[in-house]
Amino acid sequence: MKEIKGDYMINKLGWKIGGEQGEGLESTAEIFSTVVNTLGYHMYSTRDFASRIKGGHSNSKICISEEKINVIDYKTDILIAFDQATLDSYIPELDENSIIIADAKIKPEISEEIKGLVAIFPITDLAKEIAHPIIKNIITLGICSALLDIDSKLFYDMIESKFSSKGEEIVNTNIQAFDKGREIMSEFMAENNINDKYYLKKLNPTHKNMWLIGNHAAGLGALVAGCRLYAGYPITPATEIMEYLFDKLPMVNGAYIQTEDEIAALGVAIGANFAGVRAMTATSGPGISLMTEFLGMAAMAEQPVVIVDVQRGGPSSGLPTKTEQSDIFHAVYGGTGDASRIVLAPISVEDCFYTMIDAFNMAEKYQTPVIVLMDLQLGMNKETVPSFDFNRVQIDRGNLLKQEEITEEDIIYFKRYTTDVLVSNRTIPGQKGGIHNANSYEHSVVGLPSEVKRNTVRQKEKRANKIESALVERPFVLNEYNDEKDILLVGVNSTYGVLNKAAKQLKEQGMKIDTMQIRQIYPVAQAVRDTFDKYRKIYIVEHNHNKQLRTVIASKYHNSEKIASLLKYDGDIYYTHQLVEQLLEEEK
């Protein structure tokens, strides 16, 4: 047996569990991370799983740190293997201080390339002796509790909370399994002189962090923004938004509708907004493709609506459980005619909450569809976030008139689409003096179909110009690490952390790199272009093959030849070393 070298008291830790999908690995990771959150640590997670219910390899990785973390470290300190693929696939992530815990049931073949200490336990056999093979996950938690010196009571409380509804016997059986895991690891640690090398001390945080996925943060943001109707159809990786709002909307007298398809979902949401109710839908690539015609209708009829697109690998059914950022073209340009709309993009789980409030406000302020683009990594994976600041929340319903504000009550039709201003006044059904037509045809100022050339030009220019004038409060986040401006790394969604970590690493090598994370993809903010002017070279980092974000931004920038791309489109997240290697190659 190898002895762990040196004092390895943890201030950050990479924990990974792998095995066959459908065997409860995700539940193990969830219980483990929830307990670690009570210790006061920051965490950031990722999952790799197949588009099936059971079978095939999957894994979950959680990065733990005393400081704020928003990037997955490539290095793995603790690797738990319930299949041979876990032992074979992640060798490059291990070093001499790593510990590998394997289930004897898989008859593990340990490669000579594996660094670190290997512990093989009869986890499944012990689970069978206690109750059932599935309880191996609780034994695993006991193993981790001993290795990291986490108080057993924290896990007991979690087990009690999770299984109390199934009776005292089930609770006691799970506690027995946990204790067995703790016992066998304690014996192993004593035999191998591990002592306190991996202990996670309890911190004393000034506040407790939430442990959330982006989809849930977005759902809560929608509720706080005043969303009172959700219409949708289930699709990976956006379904958690639908499930969250299904549970929460009744608490605020809201309504939830699971429609027959995505087309109907957007139609219902548009109709609710027309009636004055803030409403939304959420989907992914295949779903937003079906919604395209209704997107055009909402743009033509100048109806507010919010659509969340949690991007996955495409095209078509593509890679439902892999991350990608390849719906940017569709979000910005998708549809017939000149159907401009606003496209926002949160940069973190915390920002998913605030971006949804921005989206609902902008949808009504500019009377247009607003698409909130997320990616699978941001939507489905967890991050520790501070409690949301509800004092920051402001509701802006734009030019939606109250009854007393409608001055010409005796007219037959209300001039809903006047071209005298970019954003005209808006009324809802039932208001006296507010009658107008809203449909998919080009129209006059009162909404009646019109093919008059002069009117057509004015209406098209009004719709386009109001979108071009749209600006969210923070269109991007700029991190400046150098006084001298040389290279700017630009990203969107979940790449925020990896861009900043790469910039800091390369600064140590003498490179002068700042980062910009885009929050408003379209329209391209003038401030983005002004910032670009300060740098010698701009690299846009994105998860797609067609350089979609670069194309959108470059089309609005006068010096586009200095914009280059760094791309990754294999379905996996960016790791810092990969981005660093790409950038160094480009800068040769």
What are these regions (language model features)?
Residues 204, 211-218, 223, 355, ...:
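Flexible, low-complexity linker and terminal segments
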Residues 9-91, 236-331, 342-363, 508:
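Thiamine diphosphate
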Residues 160-163, 187-207, 222-227, 246-252, ...:
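Gly-rich Lys/Arg/Thr-decorated short loops/hinges at beta-loop-alpha junctions or inter-strand turns
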